[in-house]
C-alpha cells in the first residue's frame, strides 16, 4: 500500500508521514551509499595524509560525512615521547605491539563513527604496507558490513620525497626538539624500516578483487581497479583532478550593484557608481600581481561581467557561478519577504543551509551545482573567480574546510579580494580590501538558527547531508576493553597489553596539537 507523503517545509522534498523501519544491517553493503572505509597505503612521505585531508574536505563539502583516522595520532597518544627511527624497526617487537594496538584502536573508532555517529566514510590513514595488515582491515570491514576502498600513493622521485619531508614531517611533534638535518636523517631511516616489508597493491594478481586506485608519481599516472559504486567513482574522479603545483586562487564578488544599494536579493542588476570604481581598482590590483597565464571566471549575470570587462583580459562565463536562486523571493528585500512570506522567512532564519526557497534553491543545492567549478579549480593554476555572495561562501567553505552550519554565515564583503594559497594540509587566506566603499550585505546568524536534520537520517537519504560534528581527539582509553570487544572479529590480531613507554628508551619530544557574505 502506498505510503502517505508530506512535503518538508525547510527542504521542500516529499517524505513519508511515518518513518519507515530501518533496513537490517546485513543489507548494508548492498546499498549504494553504505558506509565505506578508505584505506590509505604507501611508504611514509608519499602524500597519504595530504590526500586523506584533502579528500575528506571535499567529501564533507559535497555532503558526505567523512572523517580521517590517522594512526600516527593514536601512536603519539599511546607513546607520549618519540626517541628515534628504532621504534619502527621490524625487529622491535615491543614497538610492533604498540603499533598494532594503535591500529586496532583506530578501527574501533572507525566502527563507532560509521555505525553509531552517522558517518558515511572513514579514512584510515596509515602506511598499511603489508598484506597481513590489509587483510585485517578487510576482515574488519566485512564483519561490520562496511565497504573498503584502497588508495595507494606510490612515488620513487627522491626530490618529491625530500620535499615532502622538509615541508611536513620535520615540523611534526616527533621532531619537536630536533634540527632539520637530524630530523631528515631520522625520517629517511624510518622509511627504510618500512621498505624492507613493503608489499605494494597488486591488482593483476594478489589484489585483483580489491577496489583500489594507485596514484603514481603525484598524479602522473593512475591505476584503477573494480570501482564498486557512485561514491568510489567520485573519489577516483577527484583524485585524478587535483595537483600539487604552486598556484594562487583569487575570489571576489562583483562590484556593488543597484540591488545591493536597495537591499534586494537576486535579480540581474548592473553596477552602481561605486561598483564601477571597484572594477577599475580590481584591474589595477590584477596588474600589480603580475600573474602568468591568469584565468578569469565570471557568472552569466550582468554585475560580474561588467566587473570583468574592466580587467581587459579574456574571461569565461560559468552558469554554475550564478547567484543562488531565491525563487518567489527574487528581487525582494528581506523586509518584503518577512511581510509577504512570513513562514518562509522564519524557516530560513532557523535553517539557512538546508532551507530551499519555493521554486528556488538552498545552499545545499548550490554546493551540488558548484562541484564542477571546484573540480576545474583544482585542475587550474592561477585563477580569479568573480562571483556572488552565496557562491563565494560555498567556494570559501570548501577551501577553508568550513561546515555546512558555518557556510551561510561566512563574511564575504563587497570590494574585497580573497587571496588563497594552498599549503601542506590546507589553505592560507589573505583578505585584501581595495579601498572602495560599499554597502554591507552580511546578515548575522539568527538566534533561532538550529542544526539540520538528524545525521543518522543521512544514510538512506538520496542526498546525504554534511556532518556538523567536530573532529574528535583519538580515544585510547583502554586497550584491554578494545581487545575484548574485537576478539570475535579479529581473531588473528589480538595483541597483549600496551605499554605507555617502551622499556629501555630514553625518549625526547612531546606531542603537540597541530593544525594545520550579503545575499544569502
Curated annotation (Swiss-Prot):
Catalytic activity reads: beta-D-fructose 2,6-bisphosphate + H2O = beta-D-fructose 6-phosphate + phosphate; beta-D-fructose 6-phosphate + ATP = beta-D-fructose 2,6-bisphosphate + ADP + H(+)
Which residue positions does UniProt flag as site: Transition state stabilizer? Answer: 253, 260, 388
Q: What family is it from? A: In the C-terminal section; belongs to the phosphoglycerate mutase family.
Please identify the protein, giving its name as recorded: 6-phosphofructo-2-kinase/fructose-2,6-bisphosphatase 3
SMART domains in the cross-refs: PGAM
Q: Does the keyword Membrane apply?
A: no
- Which Gene Ontology molecular function entries are recorded, alphabetically? 6-phosphofructo-2-kinase activity; ATP binding; fructose-2,6-bisphosphate 2-phosphatase activity
- Post-translational modification Phosphothreonine, affected residues: 463, 471
Polar residues bias (residue ranges): 502-520
Q: Does the keyword Transferase apply?
A: yes
Which InterPro entries does the UniProt entry name for this protein?
A: 6Pfruct_kin, 6Phosfructo_kin, His_Pase_superF_clade-1, His_PPase_superfam, P-loop_NTPase, PG/BPGM_mutase_AS
- UniProt subunit comment: Homodimer. Forms a heterodimer with PFKFB2.
Query: Where do the annotations place ATP binding?
Result: 42-50, 164-169, 345-348, 389-393, 425
Q: Where does beta-D-fructose 6-phosphate bind?
A: 75, 99, 127, 133, 169, 190, 194
* Gene Ontology cellular-component terms listed: cytosol; nucleoplasm
- Organism of origin is Homo sapiens (Human)
Q: Where is this region: Fructose-2,6-bisphosphatase?
A: 246-520
Q: Some GO term, biological process aspect, for this entry: which one?
A: apoptotic process
Which residues lie within the region annotated Disordered? 443-520
Amino acid at each position: 500500500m502506498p505510503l502517505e507523503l508530506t512535503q518538508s517545509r525547510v527542504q521542500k522534498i516529499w517524505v513519508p508521514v511515518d518513518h519507515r523501519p530501518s533496513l537490517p544491517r546485513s543489507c548494508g553493503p548492498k546499498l549504494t551509499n553504505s558506509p565505506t572505509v578508505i584505506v590509505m597505503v604507501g611508504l611514509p612521505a608519499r602524500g597519504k595524509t595530504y590526500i586523506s585531508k584533502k579528500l575528506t574536505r571535499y567529501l564533507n563539502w559535497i555532503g558526505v560525512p567523512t572523517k580521517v583516522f590517522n594512526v600516527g595520532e593514536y601512536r603519539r597518544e599511546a607513546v607520549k615521547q618519540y626517541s628515534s627511527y628504532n621504534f619502527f624497526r621490524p625487529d622491535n617487537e615491543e614497538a610492533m605491539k604498540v603499533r598494532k594496538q594503535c591500529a586496532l584502536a583506530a578501527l574501533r573508532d572507525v566502527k563507532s563513527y560509521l555505525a553509531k555517529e552517522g558517518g558515511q566514510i572513514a579514512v584510515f590513514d596509515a602506511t598499511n604496507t603489508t598484506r597481513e595488515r590489509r587483510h585485517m582491515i578487510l576482515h574488519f570491514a566485512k564483519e561490520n558490513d562496511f565497504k573498503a576502498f584502497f588508495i595507494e600513493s606510490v612515488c620513487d622521485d627522491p626530490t618529491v620525497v625530500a620535499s615532502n619531508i622538509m615541508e611536513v614531517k620535520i615540523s611534526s611533534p616527533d621532531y619537536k626538539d630536533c634540527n632539520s638535518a637530524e630530523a631528515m636523517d631520522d625520517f629517511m631511516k624510518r622509511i627504510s624500516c618500512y621498505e624492507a616489508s613493503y608489499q605494494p597493491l597488486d591488482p593483476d594478481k594478489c589484489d585483483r578483487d580489491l577496489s583500489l586506485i594507485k596514484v603514481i608519481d603525484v598524479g602522473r599516472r593512475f591505476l584503477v581497479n573494480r570501482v564498486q559504486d557512485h561514491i568510489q567513482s567520485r573519489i577516483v574522479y577527484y583524485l585524478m583532478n587535483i595537483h600539487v603545483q604552486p598556484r594562487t586562487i583569487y575570489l571576489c564578488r562583483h562590484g556593488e550593484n543597484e540591488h545591493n544599494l536597495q537591499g534586494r536579493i537576486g535579480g540581474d542588476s548592473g553596477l552602481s557608481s561605486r561598483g564601477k570604481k571597484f572594477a577599475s581598482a580590481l584591474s589595477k590590483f590584477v596588474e600589480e600581481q603580475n600573474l602568468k597565464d591568469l584565468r578569469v571566471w565570471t557568472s552569466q549575470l550582468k554585475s560580474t561581467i561588467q566587473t570583468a570587462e574592466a580587467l581587459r583580459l579574456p574571461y569565461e562565463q560559468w552558469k554554475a557561478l550564478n547567484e543562488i536562486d531565491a525563487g518567489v523571493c527574487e528581487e525582494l528585500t528581506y523586509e518584503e519577504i518577512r511581510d509577504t512570506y512570513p513562514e518562509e522567512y522564519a524557516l530560513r532564519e532557523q535553517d539557512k543551509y538546508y532551507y530551499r526557497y519555493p521554486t528556488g534553491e538552498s545552499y545545499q543545492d548550490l554546493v551540488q551545482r558548484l562541484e564542477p567549478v571546484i573540480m576545474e579549480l583544482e585542475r587550474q593554476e592561477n585563477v580569479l573567480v568573480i562571483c556572488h555572495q552565496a557562491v563565494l561562501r560555498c567556494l570559501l567553505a570548501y577551501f577553508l574546510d568550513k561546515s555546512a552550519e558555518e557556510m551561510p554565515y561566512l563574511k564575504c564583503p563587497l570590494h574585497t579580494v580573497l587571496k588563497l594559497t594552498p599549503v601542506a594540509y590546507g589553505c592560507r587566506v589573505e583578505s585584501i580590501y581595495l579601498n572602495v566603499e560599499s554597502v554591507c550585505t552580511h546578515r548575522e546568524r539568527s538566534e533561532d538558527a538550529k542544526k539540520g536534520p538528524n545525521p543518522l537520517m543521512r544514510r538512506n537519504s538520496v542526498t546525504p547531508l554534511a556532518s556538523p560534528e567536530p573532529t574528535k581527539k583519538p580515544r585510547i582509553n583502554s586497550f584491554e576493553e578494545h581487545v575484548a570487544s574485537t576478539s570475535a572479529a579479529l581473531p588473528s590480531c589480538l595483541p597483549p597489553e600496551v605499554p605507555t613507554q617502551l622499556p629501555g628508551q630514553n625518549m625526547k619530544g612531546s606531542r603537540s596539537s597541530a593544525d594545520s557574505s550579503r545575499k544569502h
